[in-house]
């Protein structure tokens, strides 16, 4: 078995050796042809790479291609040399920006600003810069030559004389636009005629100057000023009159008269003017403490828009002011639960059981059976002139205008009098309210206090008030009726007292009789 395997291996080895020998013989027979094919392939590859090397110039590229043609067997060496030269000529990284080096950037800028190149020429040079930045200096030199060759001749340049003529013509006030543009165009067409054109323009300007009687004289200036300050003209009307004044100053007086007539015709009607009622509403709304600025401005604008509804606007403003009043409990604010507000259960309120109220059974009330009661034989009986006598004007008399008077608000409300006849104005007070509360007139208060306008008062202001006695004492007599019992004073009180006295006397007599 082993012999058989050895024999097989030997046969395999002989076969391999034979194949190898045959291959070598065949290869040796075709070597020149294979080498030629390899050279052609290397040459083609070198051609392609050299053509696409961006940093070779045309001469260098053509030289390498010629070398490849002359000796294809040296293609690898030629390609290596070309690559080395291409790399050495590559722009440095710190000088690049999209492969545009410093020379290229400078050339770009200069070519873009050459005034005598047309667009096609300028674009052509720029494209050349992009294609081969290494030729920037050469491209720029060529562009400069072309620019200079196309420059206008010296006799067509805008010289100093022409520039001066331009400036003067532009500032001639009496030329119209058409005339001015005509002279400027002539200067552009033939700068050599600048002096003549300027002289001609000056003559025309002077001939068109306004005559002395058409200049802006004093009458025109006055009309200008007055028309500018006519309050009832709109902008279009005002501008129209002013333009007419400019066009023909000799008509200044007529134009001013016409403007005044139109201004008067457009004046607000009398019923729309700020009347006295409106002024009063203005003042009060400005002093309502609980309104915001936006609310106050809104009410004032409404007053301006329609003064005829001043009362309604004021009432609405007051209602809003009261609704926005702070909720803190104090003694001076209307609408709060305090000791001075009418309609509340406190010691000073009318209609409550207190020591100062008329019609109440207390020590100072008429009709009360006490030391101050009418009908009692003492120093405080009715008819005696003392501080507690019914009908006397004191601080506790029914019907007296004081801080505890029925139907009046407390000492911090309008209408309160003090002992000196001075009223301190509170927020929301008006002269009419104060006069009504004190039994006098608004005109009287205005005269006594020397008020220029009786509606112009402010909180904290002290007003002298001329107090008057009530015309009748009906209130005092009414107060003598006791609403709870129906008894009247002093007659009923006297009768009761007399009856008690008679009963006491009868009892004493009966006692003595029994003793006897």
UniProtKB/Swiss-Prot annotation:
Pfam families membership: B (PF02216), Gram_pos_anchor (PF00746), LysM (PF01476), Octapeptide (PF03373), YSIRK_signal (PF04650)
Ranges for the Immunoglobulin-binding region B repeats: 212-269
Up-regulation conditions: More protein is secreted in a secG or double secG/secY2 mutant (at protein level).
Topology in the lipid bilayer: Peptidoglycan-anchor
Region (11 X 8 AA approximate tandem repeats): 333-420
Record-level GO cellular component terms: extracellular region
Immunoglobulin-binding region C repeats: 270-327
Keyword vocabulary terms for this entry: Cell wall, IgG-binding protein, Peptidoglycan-anchor, Repeat, Secreted, Signal, Virulence
Residues the record lists as Pentaglycyl murein peptidoglycan amidated threonine modifications: 485
Residue span(s) of domain LysM: 421-465
Immunoglobulin-binding region A repeat intervals: 154-211
Region listing for Disordered, in residue ranges: 318-440, 467-487
Compositional bias annotation for Basic and acidic residues: 318-420
Molecular function (Gene Ontology), one example: IgG binding
Biotechnology usage: Important immunodiagnostic reagent because of its ability to bind the Fab and Fc fragments of a wide range of mammalian immunoglobulins.
Family listed: Belongs to the immunoglobulin-binding protein SpA family.
Protein name according to UniProt: Immunoglobulin G-binding protein A
Gene: spa
């Amino acid at each position: 078995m082993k012999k058989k395997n050895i024999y097989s291996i030997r046969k395999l080895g002989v076969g391999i050796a034979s194949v190898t020998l045959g291959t070598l013989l065949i290869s040796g027979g075709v070597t020149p042809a294979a080498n030629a094919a390899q050279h052609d392939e290397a040459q083609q590859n070198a051609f392609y790479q050299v053509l696409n090397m961006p940093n070779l110039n045309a001469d260098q590229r053509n030289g390498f291609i010629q070398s490849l043609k002359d000796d294809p067997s040296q293609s690898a060496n030629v390609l290596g040399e070309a690559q080395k030269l291409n790399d050495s000529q590559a722009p440095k990284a710190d000088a690049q920006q999209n492969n545009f080096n410093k020379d290229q950037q400078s050339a770009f800028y200069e070519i873009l600003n050459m005034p005598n190149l047309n667009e096609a020429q300028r674009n052509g040079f720029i494209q050349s810069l992009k294609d081969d930045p290494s030729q920037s200096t050469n491209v720029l030199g060529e562009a400069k030559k072309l620019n200079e060759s196309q420059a206008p001749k010296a006799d067509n340049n805008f010289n100093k004389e022409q520039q001066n003529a331009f400036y003067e013509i532009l500032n001639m006030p009496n030329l119209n636009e058409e005339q001015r543009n005509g002279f400027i165009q002539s200067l552009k067409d033939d700068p050599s005629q600048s002096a003549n054109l300027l002289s001609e323009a000056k003559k025309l300007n002077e001939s068109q100057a306004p005559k002395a009687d058409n200049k802006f004289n004093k009458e025109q200036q006055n009309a200008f000023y007055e028309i500018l300050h006519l309050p009832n003209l709109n902008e279009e009307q005002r501008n129209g009159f002013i333009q007419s004044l400019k066009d023909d100053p000799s008509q200044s007086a007529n134009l001013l008269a016409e403007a005044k007539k139109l201004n008067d015709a457009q004046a607000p009607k009398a019923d729309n003017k700020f009347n006295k009622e409106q002024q009063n509403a203005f003042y009060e709304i400005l002093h309502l403490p609980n309104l915001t600025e936006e609310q106050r401005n809104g009410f004032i604008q409404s007053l301006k828009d329609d003064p005829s509804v001043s009362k309604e606007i004021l009432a609405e403003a007051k209602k809003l002011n009261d609704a926005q009043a702070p909720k803190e409990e104090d003694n001076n604010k209307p609408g709060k639960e305090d000791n001075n507000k009418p309609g509340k259960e406190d010691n000073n309120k009318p209609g409550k059981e207190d020591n100062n109220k008329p019609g109440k059974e207390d020590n100072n009330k008429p009709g009360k059976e006490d030391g101050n009661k009418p009908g009692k034989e003492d120093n405080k009986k009715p008819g005696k002139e003392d501080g507690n006598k019914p009908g006397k004007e004191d601080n506790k008399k029914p019907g007296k205008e004081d801080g505890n008077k029925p139907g009046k608000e407390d000492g911090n409300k309008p209408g309160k009098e003090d002992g000196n006849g001075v009223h301190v104005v509170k927020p929301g007070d008006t002269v009419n309210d104060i006069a009504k509360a004190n039994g006098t007139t608004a005109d009287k208060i205005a005269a006594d206090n020397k008020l220029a306008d009786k509606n112009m008062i402010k909180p904290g202001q002290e007003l002298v008030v001329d107090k008057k006695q009530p015309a009748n004492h009906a209130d005092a007599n009414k107060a003598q009726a006791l609403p709870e019992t129906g008894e009247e004073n002093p007659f009923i009180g006297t009768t009761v007292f007399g009856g008690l006295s008679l009963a006491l006397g009868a009892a004493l007599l009966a006692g003595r009789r029994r003793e006897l």
